[in-house]
Regions:
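PLP-dependent amino-acid enzyme catalytic core
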Residues: 6-345
Length: 345
């Protein structure tokens, strides 16, 4: 087992990165999240919170799984995409939307655009899973493939936007996206108010930023941790150095976690996240198998990353949670972010 590598939030000792623009981490207020929830509620599922006695025993904690793998389009991404697209003015919506994504955000944007009756142009890396490409096409998205690098995705999306005149719906560097993603943690804390910590995967940072805001907006004492593959560790490096780091390429099995933090999400996380935990490829596979076998739900490797560090010996103790006199064991929420995986029989 590899040791947990937490990033403890000591902002006063961190160097300040050049974020650009006038964005402030407090720009997304609680009321913004509440309005986003009201906007998307009629169109999405309120996903269940499931438990597993077996996984509780393995982790030495009470685990509460927010099952976004059972969400429409198969991931949490529909929350942010729906909020962003239904926030557009009629004039902007008529132009259509463009985005880049390895799959789940792509499907979410295509789906939400279809609900609003507008066009969606989607840039995807050529190594994106076939199941995710088929989903985008089924929802009516128009796919342009690019090289599997962060730079190629951004450059290709900019070209498609210039050619089409469509509105960019960034996968994570967008207040509307982050506010939408925050509604998953909002629901989790409404259903299970007394949590000691919440763990969520981190890639571009939209979900983790939203989880920080959505959880801590209701419970100021809850800790929030990001979970990230060792082979895609830019969030860990960014938060330890205090300078935004880029992920040039990655070969992790967690294909949904191959993006880098953006200035906006970096700013939010630097102010709010309590740590980032790195996990190995073997640990990701093990967590995925445990969920499939014990909970009988389909989760993709990217979605299972948040369980992985808790299956290590002393994994929970590394979170440094305060003792709760009302509960014998720590109570930890886990965001299962998606379930879009291709089955080959």
């Amino acid at each position: 087992m590899l040791p947990v590598k937490p990033v403890w939030n000591k902002l006063e000792s961190m160097a300040r990165a050049n974020l650009g623009g006038d964005f402030k981490p407090g720009a997304i207020e609680w009321e913004t999240i509440v309005r986003a929830h009201e906007r998307i509620r009629p169109r999405i599922h309120r996903t269940p919170v499931l438990t597993s006695a077996t996984l509780d025993a393995l982790a030495g904690a009470e685990l509460f799984f927010k099952c976004e793998n059972l969400q429409k389009t198969g991931s949490f991404k529909i929350r942010g995409a729906t909020n962003a697209i239904f926030s557009l003015s009629e004039e902007d919506a008529a132009r259509g939307v463009v985005t880049h994504s390895s799959g789940n955000h792509a499907a979410a944007v295509a789906c939400a655009a279809g609900w609003r009756g507008i066009a969606a142009w989607i840039v995807m890396p050529k190594n994106a899973p076939a199941v995710k490409c088929r989903a985008v096409e089924a929802y009516g998205g128009k796919i342009t493939f690019c090289e599997p690098t962060v730079a190629s995705r951004a450059e290709t999306a900019a070209r498609v936007q210039q050619e089409t005149g469509a509105v960019m719906v960034h996968p994570y560097d967008d207040d509307r996206i982050i506010a939408g993603q925050a509604t998953a943690a909002k629901e989790l804390l409404e259903d299970v108010p007394e949590l000691d910590a919440v763990l969520a995967p981190v890639s571009g940072g939209g979900l983790l930023s939203g989880t920080c805001l959505g959880a801590k907006g209701q419970n100021g004492t809850v800790k929030v941790f990001g979970c990230e593959p060792e082979r895609a560790d830019d969030a860990y490096r960014s938060l330890t150095s205090g300078v935004l780091q880029k992920l040039e390429s990655s070969d992790t099995i967690a294909d949904g976690l191959r993006a880098s933090l953006a200035p906006r999400t970096f700013a939010i996380l630097r102010e709010n996240v309590d740590g980032v935990l790195l996990v190995s490829e073997e640990e990701i596979v093990e967590a995925t198998k445990r969920i499939w076998e014990r909970m009988k739900v389909v989760v993709e490797p990217s979605g299972a990353v948040a369980l992985a560090p808790l299956l290590r010996s002393s994994g929970v103790s590394k979170l440094r949670l305060r003792k709760n006199s009302e509960h014998a064991k720590p109570r930890i929420g886990i965001i299962l972010s998606g379930g879009n995986v291709e089955l080959k029989c």
